[in-house]
Amino acid sequence: MNYFQLFNIEVSFDVDLQQLSSSYQTLQKTVHPDKFAHASEQEQRIAVQKSAQINDAYQTLKNPLQRAEYILVQRSVEMPNEQHSFQDTSFLMRQMELREMLEDVRHSGDVDAALLEVQSVLSTEYLQLSQVMRTQISENNAASNSAACDNLRKLKFYQKLNIEVDRLEDSLFDD
């Protein structure tokens, strides 16, 4: 089952989230387990399975990074696991710089300003990289798909670092 076909939307990194949500609600109404309360046990089980598949598809397409990964997997792009090291030394250096920047927030004289700076840098770099990956996915050739895969891993790093920023902010301001 192709998730894009299921929701009758074009395969693209950019998805109309309102259309996706509308299609999701329509599909869920047709297979909702409550509709099958008086059906046979097998029909109930099938309805539950279809409902779960629709939920999985919706959650995947709703999230930009999961959507990108899904597109690349559908194109048979080999996705390295999280433990596979980056070959991009400049990005490895950038990771260290960003982590140092985050650590410096704790020792900053103006924690608010330092946090805003980190958040701004992460947001800007995430958006720029996202735009590059969007273009690579739309090109859909071996080289662009491979590059999109590398950029997806970088975007996942930014996403995780943003979570760390949120945790740091919570810990600094909960005291």
Curated annotation (Swiss-Prot):
Q: Which GO terms describe its biological process?
A: [2Fe-2S] cluster assembly; protein complex oligomerization; protein folding
Q: What is the lineage of its organism?
A: Bacteria, Pseudomonadati, Pseudomonadota, Gammaproteobacteria, Alteromonadales
GO terms for MF? ATPase activator activity; protein-folding chaperone binding
Q: What binding partners and quaternary form does the record give?
A: Interacts with HscA and stimulates its ATPase activity.
Xref: InterPro entries: DnaJ_domain (IPR001623), HscB (IPR004640), HscB_C_sf (IPR036386), HscB_oligo_C (IPR009073), J_dom_sf (IPR036869)
The answer to keyword Cytoplasm applying to this record is no
Q: What is this protein called?
A: Co-chaperone protein HscB homolog
PANTHER family membership: IRON-SULFUR CLUSTER CO-CHAPERONE PROTEIN HSCB
Species for this entry: Colwellia psychrerythraea (strain 34H / ATCC BAA-681) (Vibrio psychroerythus)
Q: Which PROSITE patterns match?
A: DNAJ_2
| Annotated Gene Ontology cellular component terms | iron-sulfur cluster transfer complex
Keyword set for this entry?
A: Chaperone
Q: Which family does it belong to?
A: Belongs to the HscB family.
Q: Which Pfam families match?
A: DnaJ (PF00226), HSCB_C (PF07743)
